[in-house]
Amino acid sequence: MDKVKKPVLTEKTIRLLEKKQYSFDVDLKSNKTEVKHWIEKFFNVEVRAMNSHRPPGKKKYAGSIVTHSVRYKRMIITLKPGYSIPLFPNE
C-alpha cells in the first residue's frame, strides 16, 4: 500500500465521512486508477467516485534562495452504499 500514504482527518473531512467520502494523502505520481485499485483491494470496498487535488507546497527560505516543500496529492474517495472504511479502532 505504498501509493496511499495516510488518511486525512480535518474538520472538513470529518463532515465528509457522513456522506461516505474519505480523504487520503497519496503519492504525487500515482493516478486515480492505481489508488482505486489499492483502496478496493486493501479495505475490501467498492469505490463509486474519486476526486483529486494538489494543495500548494509551502515556501522555505534558505538565505536568498526560496524552495518549496514536498507537495502531495489528496484524493477524496466516495464509496458505494453499504460500504465503509474503519478509520477509528471502535468502528
From Swiss-Prot:
GO terms for biological process: translation. Pfam families: Ribosomal_L23 (PF00276). It comes from the Eukaryota. Binds to 23S rRNA. Part of the 50S ribosomal subunit. The keyword Ribosomal protein applies. Belongs to the universal ribosomal protein uL23 family. The lineage of its organism: Eukaryota, Viridiplantae, Streptophyta, Embryophyta, Tracheophyta. Keywords: Chloroplast, Plastid, Ribonucleoprotein, Ribosomal protein, RNA-binding, rRNA-binding. The keyword Ribonucleoprotein applies. The gene is rpl23. GO terms for molecular function: rRNA binding; structural constituent of ribosome. It comes from Huperzia lucidula. This is Large ribosomal subunit protein uL23c. PANTHER family: 60S RIBOSOMAL PROTEIN L23A (PTHR11620). It is found in: Plastid, Chloroplast. GO terms for cellular component: chloroplast; ribonucleoprotein complex; ribosome.
